[in-house]
Amino acid sequence: MLPEFEYAKGLFNEYGLELSEEQYEKLDIYAEFLVEYNEKVNLTAITEPDEILKKHFIDSVLMLKFVDIPRDSSMIDVGTGAGFPSVPIAVFRPDIKLTLLDSLNKRTIFLEKLCEKLGVKAEIIHGRAEEVSKNEKYREQFDVVQERSRIWLF
């Protein structure tokens, strides 16, 4: 589905990022499953292989170049949607203890299937951030909070 490995590797290199064949294969599975699942559940408007590579995968992983996340850190992605940016980050940093939070059950079902396909270990929570953040199990328990357009709750 994705453009060929050498092309993808070259794009990652342009941003100072390394891409292994194993990582590429996982991203390719991700892209294919995303587009397939998107036909029944609206997850993203971006479905062209080159755009998925650039706007979903490189944009997600680029954070690792600018933010030093210590080994074995815990990270929650609030309002994760289709898993961006945290699932691609987990492909590159499998040591991160990942929690994915989304308010829509159809997206959490997608994420469960996706993580299983990729071998990504993640706790997936179906819930609203405003409610989950009140739960002692999750409140102030993460080293990194990843979110888009959300108020600070954790």
Can you say where each PLM-predicted feature lies in the sequence?
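Conserved SAM-binding loop of SAM-dependent methyltransferases across substrates and taxa
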Residues: A82-D95
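Conserved class I S-adenosyl-L-methionine
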Residues: R71-G81
